[in-house]
A protein has these predicted regions:
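Charged/polar low-complexity intrinsically disordered segments
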Residues: 10, 17-20
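Ferredoxin-type iron-sulfur electron-transfer modules and their immediate structural context
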Residues: 21-142
C-alpha cells in the first residue's frame, strides 16, 4: 500500500509536466497560426515566369511544419494522389532535416519540384488536414 501511495504521489506531481511537454510538442497548432508564403505582386508576376509566391524561409517552414499533430490517420496522405508520406516530411522539416525530407519526397515522387508547383494542395492534402477540420487552420504543406 505504501508503494502505491508513493507511486500515485509521484504521478500526480509529474502529470502537469507531462501535459506541458505533450502540449508543446503535439499541440503547436493551437499556439501557432497558419501562415502561407506571401504572394508576389501581380504587376511583377505578369512580367515574368518566376514563382507566384516568395520564398518560404526555412525558419517559417520549420514553424509551420511543427504545427502537424502527427494524427493517427493522416488524411493528408490518404488524399494525396501519390500517397506522399506528408506527416514524415513535416516532422523532418520541423526538425530542420530538410535534405532527408527532400529524399523522402523523392521516394514516392520522381519530380517533387514540379509537383510542388502544380499540385492543388489546398484541395488535396491541406484541404483534408485534421487540424483544418478542427478550425485551427491547415498545416501549410505546399
Amino acid at each position: 500500500m505504501t508503494y502505491f501511495k508513493l507511486y500515485l504521489t509521484k504521478t500526480i506531481y509529474i502529470l502537469p509536466q507531462i501535459i506541458k511537454i505533450m502540449t508543446d510538442k503535439m499541440l503547436k497548432f493551437v499556439k501557432i497560426g497558419q501562415q502561407t508564403p506571401p504572394k508576389r505582386e501581380v504587376g511583377k508576376r505578369k512580367k515574368d515566369f518566376n514563382e507566384i509566391y516568395d520564398e518560404f524561409i526555412s525558419d517559417k517552414a520549420k514553424e509551420q511544419s511543427s504545427r502537424c499533430s502527427q494524427c493517427g490517420v493522416p488524411f493528408c496522405q490518404v488524399h494525396c494522389p501519390l500517397s506522399n508520406n506528408i506527416p514524415d516530411w513535416l516532422k523532418l522539416t520541423a526538425e530542420g532535416r530538410l535534405k532527408e525530407a527532400y529524399e523522402l519526397s523523392q521516394s514516392t515522387n520522381n519530380m517533387p519540384e514540379v509537383c510542388g508547383r502544380i499540385c492543388p494542395q489546398d484541395r488535396l492534402c491541406e484541404g483534408n488536414c485534421v487540424i483544418e477540420q478542427s478550425g485551427h487552420g491547415t498545416v501549410t504543406i505546399g
